[in-house]
């Protein structure tokens, strides 16, 4: 489904929170949305492999990487895993790498920046916890909608159709 965050903000301005404009699109799908699962991990993407192995139909992974752009939390291998398990998208408060490959995958990926240095894979981090970045607090179970204009968050799914 295609989302227009500008229209959604006009219609649901009382029900949505708007994430500060810190992010750019890196995936092949420029519009995505779904129920979020949160994870907090700093320069370590080992936990992301476990989470993206799960069925992601209708889900978006929100990764609080502490805003670090020194190491990429998402690479082509993780993005491909997410695509195979039907995740709608990934939002990374941090960096990605292998951007040419990411752009060819039919999955939404938004992040702050790209860097060629990969993350550690020790599995250090926490999932399904409250995370805060971009002026918004994210809880697993909230609903996120993203496009080239921005990212918005709602506690309940928006009636889009």
Swiss-Prot record:
Subcellular localization(s) per the UniProt record: Cytoplasm
Alphabetically ordered keywords of this record: Cytoplasm
Quaternary structure and interacting proteins, as annotated: Homotrimer. Binds to both RNA-binding sites in the C-terminal region of Rne and to RhlB.
InterPro entries linked to this entry: RraA (IPR010203), RraA/RraA-like (IPR005493), RraA/RraA-like_sf (IPR036704), RraA_gpbac (IPR014339)
Protein family per UniProt: Belongs to the RraA family.
Organism encoding this protein: Yersinia enterocolitica serotype O:8 / biotype 1B (strain NCTC 13174 / 8081)
Classification lineage: Bacteria, Pseudomonadati, Pseudomonadota, Gammaproteobacteria, Enterobacterales
Main subcellular localisation: cytoplasm
PANTHER family: 4-HYDROXY-4-METHYL-2-OXOGLUTARATE ALDOLASE 3-RELATED, REGULATOR OF RIBONUCLEASE ACTIVITY A
One GO-annotated biological process of the protein: negative regulation of RNA catabolic process
A molecular-function term among this protein's GO annotations: endoribonuclease inhibitor activity
Annotated protein name in UniProt: Regulator of ribonuclease activity A
Protein's job: Globally modulates RNA abundance by binding to RNase E (Rne) and regulating its endonucleolytic activity. Can modulate Rne action in a substrate-dependent manner by altering the composition of the degradosome. Modulates RNA-binding and helicase activities of the degradosome.
GO cellular component terms listed in the entry, alphabetical order: cytosol
A family per Pfam: RraA-like
């Amino acid at each position: 489904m295609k989302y227009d965050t500008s229209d959604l903000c006009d219609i649901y301005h009382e029900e949505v929170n708007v994430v500060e404009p810190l992010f750019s699109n890196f995936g092949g799908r420029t519009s995505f949305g779904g129920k979020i699962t949160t994870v907090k991990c700093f320069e370590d993407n080992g936990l992301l492999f476990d989470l993206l192995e799960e069925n992601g139909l209708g889900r978006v992974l929100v990764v609080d990487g502490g805003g670090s752009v020194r190491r990429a939390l998402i690479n082509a291998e993780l993005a491909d895993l997410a695509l195979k398990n039907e995740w709608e998208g990934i939002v990374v408060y941090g960096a990605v790498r292998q951007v040419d490959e990411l752009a060819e995958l039919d999955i939404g990926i938004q992040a702050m920046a790209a860097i060629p240095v990969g993350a550690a894979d020790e599995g250090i981090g926490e999932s399904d916890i409250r995370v805060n970045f971009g002026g918004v607090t994210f809880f697993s179970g909230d609903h996120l909608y993203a496009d080239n204009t921005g990212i918005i968050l709602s506690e309940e799914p928006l009636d889009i159709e």
